[in-house]
Amino acid sequence: INNDGDLSNVQSIGTNDGLWIDAPTDFATTSIGDHTYVIIASADTDSLSVVEVAPDGSMIVRDHLMDSRETRFGGVASVEIVQSDGKTYVVAGGADDGVSVLLLLEGGLLIHRASIEDTIDYSLDNISALAAVQRAAGLEIFVASSS
């Protein structure tokens, strides 16, 4: 937003810049040290992308992670970021009937830490929204299912 209240486009990013996604479904932002990151979820490409945003508004793709057998964020609909004990966690879920927890490192690298899949004990079918908070005993993840 300019000083006179008008909006202006500082920069956009896409496939020519290494952001190989289709139809982003959610995003969340965080800072680690002096660096600002946007985590972009895309259901159509079953992926999470990390984009660093510089102070001048320029952007660069730092990581791009595809869903696999070990993760549960295929068809990702929701992404949440929570910081705990000096670490930054990314929580993602969607149509793959589960939740993935990833660690975001300084430099923008995502590391898969854990996944929980839908079972008879959990209602994680078609996740539509989630939230995560830090508590004394660790992280609590709240999940809403659309089915």
Where in this protein do the model-derived segments appear?
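Feature marking well-ordered beta-strand scaffolds used for ligand recognition
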Residues: 1-147
